[in-house]
């Protein structure tokens, strides 16, 4: 299984295009195969690999995806500096829990205040939907807040369910997360301003408008 996945990548069947991104999904993948694949890909930060209950998802992000991800992180870190909020950026690090059969590589993630094993905030840029529930993965990992940037809109979720439960009891339709309009981790962040600046293609203009809105 791992060898065939590696051959798929080596054969460039997952392309790195400008506007399109590809998703490869395989079921019945063992945890060992998942970890072996991560080890094979450790020097290639381009791919995002997610795992849930034996289903493996490899995403090859488009250039547009990476542009949005970079701009999002850039603006958010400007907010942290402006408000003197201590943070630890963890980028697209791999987080996994063998006992809970879950693993993810977010587009961006952060610890707030101090370094932790699991980030407080995970952010996903969604241009193409996969079949794995990212919220269920993040619930099992214990990530407190998850943001999705989709169709020029930010969707925010805060964990209400006990991540130790086998299945979500609170807010089961959204895997234990409540949909929120204001970040509970970063209540000072003006979401409307953030969204508006993320749609500005010129990064300098986006930063200027965002910083003006912060002042």
Residue ranges and their predicted role:
Residues 1-50:
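Polyampholytic, low-complexity intrinsically disordered segments
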Residues 2-19, 74-78, 85-141, 148-215:
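C-terminal interaction segment
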Residues 30-33, 64, 68-71, 130:
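Short amphipathic alpha-helical segments
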Residues 40-45, 80-88:
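Short secondary-structure junctions
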Residues 49, 146-147:
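His/acidic/aromatic-lined binding-pocket segments of jelly-roll/cupin-type domains
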Residues 51-53, 90:
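Short Gly/Ser/Thr- and Asp/Glu-enriched loop/turn motifs at secondary-structure junctions
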């Amino acid at each position: 299984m791992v060898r065939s996945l590696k051959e798929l990548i080596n054969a460039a069947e997952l392309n790195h295009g400008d506007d399109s991104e590809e998703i490869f999904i395989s079921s019945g993948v063992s945890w060992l195969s998942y970890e072996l694949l991560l080890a094979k890909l450790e020097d290639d930060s381009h791919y995002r690999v997610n795992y849930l209950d034996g289903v493996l998802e490899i995403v090859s992000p488009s250039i547009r995806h990476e542009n949005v991800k970079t701009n999002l992180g850039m603006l958010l870190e400007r907010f942290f500096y402006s408000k003197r909020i201590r943070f630890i950026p963890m980028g697209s690090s791999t987080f996994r829990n063998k006992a809970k059969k879950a693993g993810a590589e977010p587009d961006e993630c952060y610890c707030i205040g101090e370094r932790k094993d699991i980030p407080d905030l995970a952010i996903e840029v969604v241009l193409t939907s996969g079949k794995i529930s990212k919220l269920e993965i993040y619930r099992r990992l214990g990530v407190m807040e998850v943001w999705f940037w989709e169709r020029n809109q930010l969707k925010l979720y805060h964990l209400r369910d006990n991540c130790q439960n086998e299945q979500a009891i609170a807010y089961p339709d959204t895997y234990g997360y409540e949909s929120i309009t204001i970040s509970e981790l970063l209540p000072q962040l003006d979401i409307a301003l953030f969204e508006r600046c993320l749609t500005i293609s010129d990064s300098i203009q986006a930063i200027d408008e965002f910083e003006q809105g912060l002042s």
